[in-house]
């Protein structure tokens, strides 16, 4: 897996509202982490998940993604989730990088 942490990474294909609901439920069951954009990080502050923000816009997200993936193992989580990014513009570069790190594992909600 390309630039993948040892911790399992799973992508969630959903809108923001369903993603937040899914994370809130998963955080009740096990120790989880999430890698999200800054706006999503704010909505997950009280979820019980360990939250890693990779930036406030697509450019910073693309720039910070590998560093954030490497920091995942330090969280001590059972699993880490990320929402599947938009495939438009620079989002496509983020998509291509993170899907490889997740070993192409996607949950569609």
Each language-model region and where it sits:
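A C-terminal functional module that forms or caps the active site or interfaces directly
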Residues: 1-103, 107
């Amino acid at each position: 897996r390309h630039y993948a942490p040892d911790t399992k990474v799973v992508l969630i294909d959903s809108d923001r509202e369903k993603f937040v609901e899914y994370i809130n439920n998963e955080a009740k069951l096990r120790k989880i982490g999430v890698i999200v954009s800054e706006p999503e990080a704010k909505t997950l502050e009280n979820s019980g998940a360990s939250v890693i923000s990779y930036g406030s816009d697509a450019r910073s997200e693309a720039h910070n993604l590998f560093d954030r993936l490497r920091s995942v193992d330090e969280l001590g989580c059972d699993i880490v989730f990320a929402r599947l990014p938009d495939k438009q513009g620079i989002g496509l570069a983020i998509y291509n990088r993170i899907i490889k790190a997740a070993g192409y594992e996607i949950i569609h909600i």
